[in-house]
Amino acid sequence: MFSGWGVRTLAASMPGYNPISYHCGSVWPHDTAIVVAGLARYGLVEHSQRLLSALIDAGVALGGRLPELFSGLDRAEFACPVGYPTSCSPQAWAAASPLLCLRTIMRLDPWVPYGKTWLAPTLPEGIKRLKVAGIPLAGSRVTVEVEGDDVHVEGIPDHIELVTEPRHPATAV
């Protein structure tokens, strides 16, 4: 289902596949972002980062703005994602996709009512340093800086325990 730019809505091997149809083979950035997050959540970080890198590449190739969808034509055949004729750009959930991807890179999982926040960043290849400032958390603003394996966090409220490992999918509080 991977086109080289993102996850298609239908695999190329399936009957009915049409890479330039709305729902039968196109790539929707928000679907890809959800898959990126799910793969990382269940420990498949390398797979997650492969999709994340492809989505970043698509965004760069499309001028820094992810559209609602683009065609599912294979990256091996085209140097940039092929647009979908009536795709909206900007489009709300496509515009939100990079935020989910950023949270996924940080593996940020706040559970404020229970007094815990998990943070275990993993930078994808090509990103050497990341700084995110002003993250709202329990009435405070948090800054996270990542460079390689070094992580520096400022602004965590005293009543929040910072857990510096990924939260296991089945973790109960």
Model-derived segments and their meaning:
Residues G25-T32, Y42-L51, G59-L66:
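Active-site-proximal binding-pocket segments
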Residues P19, T32, P85-T86, K128:
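Generic preference for well-ordered secondary structure
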Residues G25-R41, S89-R103:
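Well-ordered alpha-helical segments within folded domains of soluble proteins
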Residues S87-K128:
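Catalytic cores of secreted or luminal carbohydrate-active enzymes
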